[in-house]
């Protein structure tokens, strides 16, 4: 059976945790930042976890994670 290819874009975006979840970076922090409050930007800097409903899709993209 051939190897399954890892989706490279997903490999750069998600990191697997020891408990089996996936860490991800928050969006909305690339441009148009002047209208966003400092508090909002500060909270967006922190990592977040992938939701349970989306975890199946991430696992399919990262077969060896």
UniProtKB/Swiss-Prot annotation:
Record carries keyword Transmembrane: no
Entries under Pfam families matching the protein: Ribosomal_L35p (PF01632)
Superkingdom of the source species: Bacteria
HAMAP family referenced in this protein's UniProt entry, alphabetically: Ribosomal_bL35
GO biological process: translation
Cellular compartments per GO CC: cytosolic large ribosomal subunit
Family designation: Belongs to the bacterial ribosomal protein bL35 family.
Compositionally biased spans, kind Basic residues: 10-26
Keyword Acetylation: no
Stretches assigned to coiled coil: none
Lineage of source species: Bacteria, Pseudomonadati, Pseudomonadota, Gammaproteobacteria, Pasteurellales
The species this protein was found in: Histophilus somni (strain 2336) (Haemophilus somnus)
Protein name, UniProt field: Large ribosomal subunit protein bL35
Keywords, sorted A to Z: Ribonucleoprotein, Ribosomal protein
PANTHER family for this protein: 54S RIBOSOMAL PROTEIN BL35M, LARGE RIBOSOMAL SUBUNIT PROTEIN BL35M
Region listing for Disordered, in residue ranges: 1-26
Molecular-function annotations in GO: structural constituent of ribosome
């Amino acid at each position: 059976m051939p190897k399954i290819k890892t989706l490279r874009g997903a490999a750069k975006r998600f990191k697997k945790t020891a408990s089996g979840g996936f860490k991800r970076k928050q969006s909305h922090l690339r441009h148009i930042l002047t209208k966003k409050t400092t508090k909002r930007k500060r909270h967006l800097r922190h990592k977040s976890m992938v939701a349970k409903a989306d975890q199946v899709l991430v696992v399919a993209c990262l077969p060896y994670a």
